[in-house]
Amino acid sequence: MEEDRGSALAAESALEKNVAELTVMDVYDIASLVGHEFERVIDQHGCEAIARLIPKVVRVLEILEVLVSRHHVAPELDELRLELDRLRLERMDRIEKERKHQKELELVEDVWRGEAQDLLSQIAQLQEENKQLMTNLSHKDVSFSEEEFQKHEGMSERERQVMKKLKEVVDKQRDEIRAKDRELGLKNEDVEALQQQQTRLMKINHDLRHRVTVVEAQGKALIEQKVELEADLQTKEQEMGSLRAELGKLRERLQGELNQNGEEEPVAELGGEECVSEAEKVAMDLKDPNRPRFTLQELRDVLHERNELKSKVFLLQEELAYYKSEEIEEENQIPQPPPIAHPRMSPQPESGIKRLFSFFSRDKKRLANTQRNVRIHETFGQWANCHRDDGYTEQGQEALQHL
């Protein structure tokens, strides 16, 4: 009863939650609450009143379960996709900046080459003029005046200044080109580091998706086991209640028939024998080697430990398969970029909601069996009334006890 109250409170709290905060367990709590309401309706009006409604409700709850599971997986995938898109945009921006920088370097080199070509042409022209002057000086025996000598010295000084300026410009441009090359190397190193970070993030994303699928499979398996155990427990309790009710009716009917026949003493003897047989049965149960030796809580603890061990074994198997696949890929040595793993919709197993609502079909079978047993008891009572004067034989009493 306390577990039922706890599940009912959990289902009511799940109904009061916000839609964005719902989990798969909340959906199953809601399904449990709906199942209890169906039980009440069946107890009052029978199974035929809601026989056509149950499949539709089950389908709606399954759709809600799928949507909630997608909603919990979608935010993490969206964040990873946004991070990947941001890294791609940064990479594209850096590539674009490198292209612009390369174009600027090419333009600077073209300008430098043009200026160098002009200066070289000027140098060649000056050298030609110098040669002509030297030839003219060799052919002429005219002595230069001091003014002409100073003029010639000024021309040579001007050439030296031009050459010095050209050398300074060339050295400066060479230093700029070296600095640009260094910056380009640093940019390339940054791009390689970003690519390595991108591959690492994609690998982490793949591992996280793998773990999410494993955890979802474990959760679904545990939820299905819980639902099956709850359904079995409910059916067993209902069967025990029906059997107790039938046993009480049979005892009342037997006592009434014996009182009508005026055989009160055999009834007392029969009651004494039943008490003795029950005491012997208790003694035999205490001596029985197959009697239960565990409490319900201990059994639950053992089942819980078994489920944890199963989940650990499942995780280890998944990790072993994953590492084996990585070793096979490394042996093949095929350098391929890690693919972007898009989430694929795996074939959905049988939902736990169907298992939760499957006990209604068992209730129908149980009601049919109880009706058949009641008919048998009625026919047996009619036969006993017809043969009231003859008394009960030993075979009839054994059959009555068996029933």
From Swiss-Prot:
GO terms for biological process: cilium assembly; epithelial cell morphogenesis; nitric oxide mediated signal transduction; protein transport from ciliary membrane to plasma membrane. Belongs to the RILPL family. Its main location: cytoplasm. This is RILP-like protein 1. Residues 10-97 form the RH1 domain. It comes from Bos taurus. Keywords: Cell projection, Cilium, Coiled coil, Cytoplasm, Cytoskeleton, Phosphoprotein, Protein transport, S-nitrosylation, Transport. The modification S-nitrosocysteine is found at C47. It comes from the Eukaryota. InterPro entries: DZIP_RILPL, RH1, RH2, RILP_dimer. Residues 291-356 form the RH2 domain. The modification Phosphoserine is found at S7. One of its GO terms (molecular function) is small GTPase binding. It is found in: Cytoplasm, Cytosol; Cytoplasm, Cytoskeleton, Microtubule organizing center, Centrosome, Centriole; Cytoplasm, Cytoskeleton, Cilium basal body. Pfam families: RH1, RILP. GO terms for cellular component: centriole; centrosome; ciliary basal body; cilium; cytoplasm; cytosol; membrane. The lineage of its organism: Eukaryota, Metazoa, Chordata, Craniata, Vertebrata. Residues 76-265 form a coiled coil. Transmembrane segments: none annotated.
